[in-house]
Amino acid sequence: ILLEKRNKLLKVLYEQHDIDVQTLELSLAEPLPAKPYPLPSGAPHYLELLKKTHPGTARFYTDMDSALQKNLRRIFEHRSREFSHQGINNAAALIIETATGKILAYCGNTGLDGRNARTSAVDIVQARRSSGSLLKPFLYAAMLDSGHLLPDQLVIDIPTRIGSYKPDNNVPLYRGAVPASEALSRSLNIPAVRMLREYGISRFLDYLKQCGFSTFTRSADEYGLPLILGGGEITLHEAVLAYAQLMNAACTRPAFTGRQALRWIAFPFLPEPHG
């Protein structure tokens, strides 16, 4: 009975032009395996995303690179085992083509081998998580674009209290005045908070939405200045797309030289549709 079902399925695949005649003949000649084997599951979270965003579709054509996906999964699972000893049981990875935003490899979570059965089904690429310091480059870009900041302009890094809010750096060290480019490269918290206050929270939220972030649904007053230090939630997918467009824009204009005030031309952060 199993052999008949197998052969019938192979013939259906041939009739649908999914396999050629040589593959059909070779497959029909193959004996049945001694036991059932699990179906291949190369990118289960991405498949679930496609099913969710394209209901009723039974077949999907993607831009994924199968070799890259397999290599990413191998490295990903190996590293996740190391991190599990530190109590880190969830992680995600996404690789895109920066020029188009096309997804080339997608790992939504760790533990797909059964090690983390309780939470491995959660797709962290699409899940909302604290932004941490990921929004700082966008604040710097917004201020450069608007003429509020120069790369070598000195920004203040001193103990700061704004109302009841007292931000601090990751290490208890204050540098006084530092170039804006250095403050960004060191991911200093206090300069970022002071810059957000100068630029305006509401204005920055509008800028983030233009960048493609859809998760900022509360008011500027609700987010407050902690927004720049992880007080808001983003998804990894939207962050990767936004960073790709940030990179694309930076690569198409001359580098800043000294204190020269080169205005950044506004640019779209969402990938353009490709047929």
Q: For each predicted feature, which ranges?
A:
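A penicillin-recognizing enzyme superfamily signal
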Residues: 62-83, 95-97, 106, 114-127, ...
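Conserved catalytic neighborhood of penicillin-recognizing serine enzymes
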Residues: 37-52, 149-204, 248, 252, ...
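Stable alpha-helical elements in mature extracytoplasmic
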Residues: 2-9, 23, 46, 50, ...
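Acidic/histidine-enriched alpha-helical segments
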Residues: 2-4, 15-33, 88-96, 155-161, ...
